[in-house]
């Protein structure tokens, strides 16, 4: 019988094919039409060819993949579909080798869609602690809870967005607006997760700096027209390496098992089919040995994404076609393998990378370590496959409580240490019950939301701010403590007269009560989230930087009537402080990012002195909103929006911009008051290793490998479904239909396409996170600190580096070290900060490598980028 296998080549959203002869050139060069382009780079580097700690994992993975059939390999690469299996993402299983459906679950703040879990302090709040120990402990606590709920792969941490746009919707998920801070926090988080046998998935790779236009089919507000393509984050070459790629390098060095590619385009090619980003930058230059998974629906092509370095498609269906049973991969990837449009070696590499990552991170699941919850229902029993109501009824929720003393203590510690004291006149804080016997608390953001907190992905914003909204939120935390609950408790405990006024619009009662109060606390907020939810006209990104729920007017009213007003700002990013920062009656201001479930406890503990403030700002707060990089809302008539603000600012992101332009901020990056001042002495910088200008050449790759059975099946009947398969509606299977046979594919490959593996990495590559020499200690900085106050406090010495003024590459000041230190009165402590070779390096766009320029460097030691206590010159 003659049967036809017709490869379905989906072209939806394919990148513009750019004919570039030298596909190793920088993607930041403009073509004649001034369009930013991302060159092609092939093939995908085969995993397992670095001489590193992944070798054992690859040996174990190869032993299994070498015995797998084509459909078994395909089943590992493709999600089974939305709302069918219990997690937000689920791969197919391979029962013959004891591999169950892999469970991938959001997110960076805790286990999404699961009961009894903890909503942890956001990444932004965590970054504000500047505490490396807490970075790790939070990761360990997250790992414990994910593991306890049966999750195999946690979709976090987030280091994209980098936070270059103050109004960016998802800034709260990541750790702040500096790549060094982000990378340090991400690496520790990854280690903590993976120590608990849960694979981390660092995201979003790369340039996902705003929610507006992040996907096709968005609305241009100026024309009301639908966009054709997602926004292109146009990123220059130096900025790509020095800023956006930097924390991903830290993540790879930490052994992260998976990387999630983002929805947006990067230099006019979609991130999940961008061969330069995935094949060259991530897998070759950074030496990433794990697998790349698409953001949910971010895969916009079949063959093209496969040869460009994508390894796993989630949730499996095509963009815009969830619960339709239609996939770019699954059955279509099987077809592409049989007609050789996608090389079998690429499929082998996908499957091997996935299994090797499971082994390397100790997250390889057993058949009895499965999800004990359903993402889709809170009921104890439900359909085995939720979206197919014809399937059997089984127990889907086991009500497992994953928390313990360690997880709860960690959540509170991180929340407390993240709170930043911005102003404290007349020693207003900590609150003295003897001096402030009548206490007023006001603001919607102090109390519970009238509709509770289990609203759609935490988009309820008429109460205390615990999280931002979207897939990065925790939908069903075990409990949440508002500032009202804990402040009222401490007020009663201290026998204070206490009142709480929730009303933030009709301010007559606030005016009356504030005039009688000895001290007034005003809790205000500003929220943001993911772009698929719009709250009060905020489509993920914030429309402006004002406070929500009339917060600015509330502060003004209270301060005009109470001479001792404390303002507590809780927000997902920067807000405008100019209306009240200098008000004489606003005697204290604290800022907190989304603090998670223990938010109220942490805030109250800081205000009443049960814990001392030790947080530092993870971003710059400007005096004027025009000093921030704006959200791009313009879309041309072509319907292909581009973000050139990233080009215009280049390396000058956040504090780099303010320092370079000599702009005085309201509050600088790294700023945070404590109850002590600190004296710095004996500052030294000493060489640990001779540093040459150029990196050493990396070791050659290990030999390329192939599986003996890679070409053993050319009979499509081998890929037919088993006769006894009981199909689930809209479930994605890898099997070919039984009425097909093989036909040669007719795919037009991009210019420069090749399947020939390289024998040697490029110069900046060759190791996890890049050339191993980049990670060697080059210099040590030592400084002695002595507290000048009477309390035991924690503070954060910060090291900023200035490059030689006569260097070839103009390089702005940048954070290159920090350490959180606790000192008692009179105690002296020496703090050692290490400078790695990469910390001294600049990206040479001509050589396409990192170099260390000769000349005089300056190490500046301070407690904020604009509050330097001492500096040391050293010459290379």
From Swiss-Prot:
Single biological process term from Gene Ontology: cellulose catabolic process
Known glycosylation sites: 22, 75, 224, 267, 332, 339, 372, 389, 426, 544, 585, 739, 780, 790
Similarity comment: Belongs to the glycosyl hydrolase 3 family.
Keywords: Carbohydrate metabolism, Cellulose degradation, Glycoprotein, Glycosidase, Hydrolase, Polysaccharide degradation, Signal
Pathway stated in the Swiss-Prot or TrEMBL entry: Glycan metabolism; cellulose degradation
PANTHER family the UniProt entry points to: BETA-GLUCOSIDASE (PTHR42715), BETA-GLUCOSIDASE F-RELATED (PTHR42715:SF2)
Upper lineage: Eukaryota, Fungi, Dikarya, Ascomycota, Saccharomycotina
Listed InterPro entries: Cellulose_deg_GH3, Fn3-like, Glyco_hydro_3_AS, Glyco_hydro_3_C, Glyco_hydro_3_C_sf, Glyco_hydro_3_N, Glyco_hydro_3_N_sf, Glycoside_hydrolase_SF
Secretion signal, residue range per the UniProt entry: 1-17
Catalytic-site annotation from UniProt: 295
Known catalytic reactions: Hydrolysis of terminal, non-reducing beta-D-glucosyl residues with release of beta-D-glucose
Pfam families: Fn3-like, Glyco_hydro_3, Glyco_hydro_3_C
Protein name: Beta-glucosidase 1
Record GO terms (molecular function): beta-glucosidase activity
EC number: 3.2.1.21
């Amino acid at each position: 019988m003659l049967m036809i296998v017709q490869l379905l080549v989906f072209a939806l959203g394919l990148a513009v094919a750019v004919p570039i002869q030298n596909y190793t050139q920088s993607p930041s060069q403009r073509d004649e039409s001034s369009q930013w382009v991302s060159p092609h780079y092939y093939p995908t580097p085969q995993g397992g060819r670095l001489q590193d700690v992944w070798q054992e994992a690859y040996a174990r993975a190869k032993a299994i993949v070498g015995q797998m059939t084509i459909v078994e390999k395909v089943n590992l690469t493709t999600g089974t579909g939305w709302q069918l299996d219990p997690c937000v993402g689920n791969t197919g299983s391979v029962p013959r080798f004891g591999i169950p459906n892999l469970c991938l679950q959001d997110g960076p703040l805790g286990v999404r869609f699961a009961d009894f879990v903890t909503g942890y302090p956001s990444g932004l709040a965590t970054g504000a602690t500047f505490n490396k120990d807490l970075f790790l402990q939070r990761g360990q606590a997250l790992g414990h809870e994910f593991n306890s709920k049966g999750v195999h792969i946690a979709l976090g941490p987030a280091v994209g967005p980098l936070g270059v746009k103050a109004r960016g919707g998802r800034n709260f998920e990541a750790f702040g607006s500096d790549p060094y801070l982000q990378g340090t926090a991400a690496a520790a988080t990854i280690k903590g997760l993976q120590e608990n046998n849960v694979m981390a998935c660092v995201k979003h790779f790369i340039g996902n700096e705003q929610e507006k236009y992040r996907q096709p089919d968005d609305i241009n507000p100026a024309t009301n027209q639908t966009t054709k393509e997602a926004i292109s984050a146009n990123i220059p070459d130096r900025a790509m390496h020095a800023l956006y790629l930097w924390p991903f390098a830290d993540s790879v060095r930490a052994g992260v098992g998976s990387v999630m590619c983002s929805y947006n385009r990067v230099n006019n090619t979609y991130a999940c089919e961008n061969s330069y980003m995935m094949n060259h930058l991530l897998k070759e230059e950074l030496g990433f040995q794990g697998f790349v998974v698409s953001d949910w629906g971010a895969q916009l092509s079949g063959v093209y994404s496969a040869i460009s370095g994508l390894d796993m498609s989630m949730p499996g269906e095509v963009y815009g076609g969830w619960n339709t049973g239609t996939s770019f991969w699954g059955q279509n990837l099987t077809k592409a393998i049989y007609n050789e449009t996608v090389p079998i070696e690429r499929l082998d590499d996908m499957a091997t990378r996935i299994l090797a990552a499971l082994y390397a991170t100790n997250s390889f699941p057993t058949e009895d370590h499965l999800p004990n919850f359903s993402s889709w229902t809170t009921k104890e029993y439900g359909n085995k496959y939720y979206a197919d109501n014809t399937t059997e009824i089984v127990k889907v929720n086991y009500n497992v409580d994953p928390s313990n003393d360690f997880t709860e203590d960690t959540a509170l510690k991180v929340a407390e240490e993240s709170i930043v004291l911005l102003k404290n006149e007349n020693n207003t804080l900590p609150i003295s019950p003897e001096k402030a016997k009548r206490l007023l608390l006001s603001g919607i953001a102090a109390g519970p939301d009238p509709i509770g907190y289990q609203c759609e992905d935490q988009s309820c914003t008429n109460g205390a701010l615990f999280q931002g909204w979207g897939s990065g939120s925790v939908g069903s935390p075990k409990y949440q403590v508002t500032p009202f609950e804990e402040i009222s408790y401490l007020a009663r405990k201290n026998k204070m007269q206490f009142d709480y006024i929730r009303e933030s619009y009709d301010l007559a009662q606030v005016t009356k009560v504030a005039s009688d109060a000895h001290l007034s606390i005003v809790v205000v907020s500003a929220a943001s989230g993911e772009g698929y939810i719009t709250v009060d006209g905020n489509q993920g990104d914030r429309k402006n930087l004002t406070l929500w729920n009339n917060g600015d007017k509330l502060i003004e009213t209270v301060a005009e009537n109470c001479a001792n007003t404390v303002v507590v700002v809780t927000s997902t990013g920067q807000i405008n402080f100019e209306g009240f920062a200098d008000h004489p009656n606003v005697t204290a201001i604290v800022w907190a990012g989304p603090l998670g479930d223990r938010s109220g406890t942490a805030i109250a503990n800081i205000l009443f002195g049960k814990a001392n403030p030790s947080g530092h700002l993870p971003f710059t707060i400007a005096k004027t909103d025009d000093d921030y990089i704006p959200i791009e809302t313009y879309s041309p008539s072509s319907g292909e929006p581009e973000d050139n603000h990233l080009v215009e600012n280049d390396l000058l992101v956040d504090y780099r911009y303010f320092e370079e332009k000599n702009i005085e901020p309201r509050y600088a990056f790294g700023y945070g008051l404590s109850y002590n001042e600190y004296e710095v002495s004996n500052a030294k910088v000493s060489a640990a290793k001779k540093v040459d200008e150029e990196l050493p050449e990396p070791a050659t790759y290990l030999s390329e490998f192939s599986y003996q059975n890679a070409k053993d099946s050319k009979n499509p009947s081998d890929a037919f479904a088993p006769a006894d398969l009981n199909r689930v509606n809209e479930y994605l299977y890898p099997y070919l239909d039984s009425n097909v046979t093989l036909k040669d594919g007719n795919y037009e490959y991009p210019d420069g396409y090749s399947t020939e593996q390289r024998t040697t990495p490029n110069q900046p590559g060759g190791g996890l996170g890049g050339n191993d020499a980049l990670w060697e200690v080059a210099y040590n900085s030592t400084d002695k600190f002595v507290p000048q106050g009477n309390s035991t406090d924690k503070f954060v010495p910060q090291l900023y580096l200035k490059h030689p003024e006569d260097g070839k590459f103009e390089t702005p000041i940048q954070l290159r070290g920090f350490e959180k230190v606790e000192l008692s009165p009179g105690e002296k402590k020496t703090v050692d900060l290490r400078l790695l070779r990469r910390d001294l390096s600049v990206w040479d766009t001509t050589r396409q490598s990192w170099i260390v320029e000769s000349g005089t460097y300056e190490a500046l030691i301070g407690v904020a980028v604009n509050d330097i206590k001492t500096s040391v010159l050293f010459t290379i």
